[in-house]
């Protein structure tokens, strides 16, 4: 019954998209769609795929994310403290390590990031390395999620972190190569897609529900905002480092080797 409900809800979500596309094609552009059977088959696959993906989220990703957060913050798992003593933020180091690892691994496997990095490499003519771009984005995502978990543990307001991150983004935008800035901002958006968002949301909600004094509504959300910002920072940082290395190679003075002095002539009167 739940499966049928999800299939029906997904169909209702896809129908407006299909109506807009076909409406513009036939009413505004007034041209027939080439290979219409393939297009319809593609829409059918999208419908089935999204429905099964949503089922997988409900059955696996959301429960596992919340379960990992609750297990890593369980008092039996954390270092023992005396009764009445407030737990130190460093006691949750396994939470930070898990957040960093899951953030990096899910980003590397993100289909939208793979597609964008390949396209960026093709358009740039090989100037942008697709794999290094994915690594830079993955590191940014990992740092953002780790910082988000630390914020939940500390209970600090989200706006402080967002303000500081945006200030850093603005400074980097002024000093980064202009060609990389649009790609850096797009990289922050493509990371928060089908794979990463469910795990991040489940981890944040589970962590906020497991730590005493935290609210799932006030503290559980907000990790996705940091996950979007930090890939922008790391991609522009990667571009700045690459630019600095390139300038360093160009300005490195070439060693000039002086010619060896000619051999001295022997004394003619020596013999």
From Swiss-Prot:
Optimum pH is 9.0. Exhibits antiport activity at a wide pH range of 6.5 to 9.5. Signal peptide: none annotated. It is a multi-pass membrane protein. The chain crosses the membrane at residues 2-22, 36-56, 94-114, 130-150, 152-172, 193-213, 216-236. Pfam families: DUF1538. GO terms for biological process: potassium ion transport; sodium ion transport. GO terms for molecular function: antiporter activity. GO terms for cellular component: plasma membrane. It is found in: Cell membrane. InterPro entries: NaLiK_antip_UmpB, UmpAB. Disulfide bonds: none annotated. Keywords: Antiport, Cell membrane, Ion transport, Membrane, Potassium, Potassium transport, Sodium, Sodium transport, Transmembrane, Transmembrane helix, Transport. Residues 252-271 are annotated as: Disordered. Belongs to the UmpA/UmpB family. Heterodimer composed of UmpA and UmpB. Part of a two-component antiporter that catalyzes the efflux of Na(+), Li(+) and K(+) in exchange for external protons. Shows a preference for Na(+), followed by K(+) and Li(+). This is Na(+), Li(+), K(+)/H(+) antiporter subunit B. It comes from Vreelandella zhaodongensis. The gene is umpB.
